C-alpha cells in the first residue's frame, strides 16, 4: 500500500469470517478506526508522528477488545503485567516499560521514560512509581478485569486432554509518518494468557518488537515474542533495508515470513517507510490491521480472507 500516513495492528493469529458475531466485528473495526482517526487528526494539525502513534495506541489500550491496557490478558497468578515501547525515527530515541501493574496507559509511560529519564527501559514496581511521579494515569488491577480474559485464563489452566496450552494474540501497535517524513513506532501488550509471572516478550524490546529509523522504516511486531527477541526481528527489517537496499515490502516479508518461521515461530508486523509505503507481512493465517491514507480513507482488515498470508 502507498500514501499511508498511519497504520495500526491488533495482533497476528487466525480470525476466520463467521467466527465472531456481527457486533464483535463492528467493535474490532470501530476500535481500529477510532485509533486511526485520533492519530490522523494530530498529523493533520502538523504534530509529529511520535504523537500520532502514542495517541493511536492509547485508544487501543482503552478498548477491551484488544490485548493491551484495559483488555490485557491474565498471567498465571491472575494478574495483568503490561509491556509497551515507543521509538522516534528522527533521532532513534526510545522508551519502554515491562511488567507494570497499575499504569492505565503503558504506552504513555514508555514515552515518559524516553523523555523524562536517562533510561530506555524500566520495569515492574519502579516503572509504576515513575508513572505516579510523572502524572501518567494510575489505576488498580480491578480496572483491567474483563470476563473474556478471565475465561481464557481458566481455559488455559484446564486444557482438553492432549490439547495445547492456549495463547492469546491481539497485541497492538502503530506506525506513522508525518509532514516532515519523520517516522515513529509504538507497541503495547498484555503478553500471553497464563504466562509465568515476570515473563517479558518482544513488545517492550527495542529492535525486537519495535523499531523506527528515518533512513529506513518504522515497525511494530506481533507474534511469538521469545522468537522475535532471538531474531531481533524489527531491527533486522531495518538492517536489510539499510545494508542491502531492499524495499520495505521485501525486507519485512523476508524476516517475518522466512526468518521467524525458520526459528520455529509465527507472527506478523506492520512496517511503514518514510515515503508512506506500508507492508503487512505475516506467517499466521491473518493479521488484524488497518491504515489511513493521506486523503483520510480508512481501510480495516480483520478476517483471514482480508489479510492473505504474504
Positions of PLM-derived features:
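Alpha/propeptide regions of enzymes that mature by internal proteolysis
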Residues: 1-310
Amino acid at each position: 500500500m502507498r500514501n499511508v500516513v498511519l497504520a495500526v495492528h491488533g495482533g497476528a493469529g487466525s480470525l476466520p469470517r463467521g467466527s465472531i458475531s456481527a457486533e464483535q466485528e463492528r467493535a474490532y473495526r470501530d476500535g481500529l478506526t477510532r485509533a486511526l482517526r485520533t492519530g490522523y487528526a494530530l498529523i493533520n494539525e502538523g504534530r509529529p508522528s511520535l504523537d500520532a502513534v502514542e495517541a493511536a495506541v492509547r485508544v487501543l489500550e482503552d478498548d477491551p477488545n484488544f490485548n493491551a491496557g484495559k483488555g490485557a490478558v491474565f498471567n498465571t497468578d491472575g494478574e495483568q503485567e503490561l509491556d509497551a515501547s515507543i521509538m522516534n525515527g528522527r533521532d532513534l530515541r526510545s522508551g519502554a516499560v515491562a511488567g507494570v501493574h497499575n499504569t492505565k496507559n503503558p504506552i504513555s509511560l514508555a514515552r515518559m521514560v524516553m523523555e523524562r529519564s536517562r533510561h530506555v527501559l524500566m520495569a515492574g514496581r519502579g516503572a509504576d512509581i515513575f508513572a505516579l511521579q510523572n502524572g501518567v494515569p494510575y489505576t488498580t488491577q480491578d480496572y483491567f478485569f474483563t470476563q473474556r480474559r478471565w475465561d481464557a485464563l481458566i481455559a488455559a489452566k484446564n486444557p482438553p486432554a492432549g490439547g495445547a496450552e492456549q495463547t492469546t494474540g491481539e497485541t497492538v501497535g502503530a506506525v506513522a509518518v508525518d509532514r516532515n517524513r519523520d517516522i515513529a513506532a509504538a507497541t503495547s501488550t498484555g503478553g500471553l494468557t497464563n504466562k509465568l509471572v515476570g515473563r517479558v516478550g518482544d513488545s517492550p524490546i527495542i529492535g525486537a518488537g519495535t523499531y523506527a529509523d528515518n533512513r529506513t522504516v518504522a515497525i511494530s511486531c506481533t507474534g511469538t515474542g521469545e522468537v522475535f527477541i532471538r531474531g531481533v526481528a524489527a531491527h533486522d527489517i531495518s538492517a536489510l533495508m539499510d545494508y542491502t537496499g531492499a524495499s520495505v515490502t521485501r525486507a519485512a516479508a523476508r524476516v517475518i515470513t522466512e526468518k521467524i518461521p525458520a526459528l520455529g515461530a509465527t507472527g506478523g508486523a506492520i512496517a511503514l517507510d518514510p515515503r508512506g509505503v506500508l507492508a503487512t507481512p505475516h506467517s499466521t493465517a491473518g493479521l488484524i490491521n488497518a491504515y489511513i491514507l493521506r486523503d483520510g480513507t480508512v481501510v480495516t482488515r480483520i478476517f483471514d480472507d482480508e489479510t492473505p498470508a504474504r
